[in-house]
Amino acid sequence: MRQIYAKQVIMEENKEYCYKYPHAAITADNVVFGFDGKGLYVLLIKRGEGTYEDFWALPGGFMHIDETIEQCALRELQEETNAKDVYLEQFHVFSTVDRDPRERVVTVGFLALVRKGDYSNVRGGDDAKEAKWFNYEQLPQLAFDHQEIIAKAHSALRDRMRSNGLAFCLLDQKFGVDELRSLCEAVFDTKYDRRNFYKKFTSAPYILEDEGEQPMACRRAAHYSL
């Protein structure tokens, strides 16, 4: 017990760890999906000075010694894109040995789902020259292994859409069937028959039809909520 305490004191005084094993750096990378009612978008930043300068990449960065990985993800997202109050969910860890040419880096991937219109004022900050939304089907060449990270995030988005409806975060609180169909087509890269989709969708127990002011003749244009 005394030996452990002594190590803690030494670590506090020297501000460094005492372990003999080399340490990998830890980063957070954020895949922020946005939906505009028709297509799926990804929020990217243009890198500043250093490795992969002027390449587009995911917003993210190195974890500070005094913060959690979740705090790191939120901080980096806000610093580099000005996006605030974003719900982030961890989806995967990427640890390929040579994924970063600078040093040994393990990154934790975070997935975010937003309505693109709510974050139209994104802008580059900190070490990001620029922040911009890109259509998921038209992504530029990316730095590091970020193409792989986005693909994994897209797969995770599909899983969450099937299991817990997380992708509904991309819709307004009240939404039309056609808007949901567009979202599903964007997420699953599949075209759905409008009539069959409507029948399957309206039978879901967690979907409520808005009985507000819609006349019976306009049921196909009705709005729904969770």
Predicted regions and their residues:
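N-terminal strand-loop-strand
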Residues: 15-57, 70
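Active-site segment of metal-dependent pyrophosphate-handling enzymes
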Residues: 24-28, 70-71, 82-121, 137-138, ...
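Short, His- and charge-rich active-site/binding loops that engage polyanionic ligands
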Residues: 42, 47-49, 53, 60, ...
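Hydrophobic alpha-helical positions that pack around
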Residues: 59, 73, 77
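NUDIX/MutT-family hydrolases
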Residues: 121-157, 170-178, 196-206
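Short helix-coil junctions and helix-kink-helix linkers
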Residues: 182-190
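Long, intrinsically disordered, low-complexity Ser/Thr/Pro-rich regulatory/activation regions
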Residues: 210-226
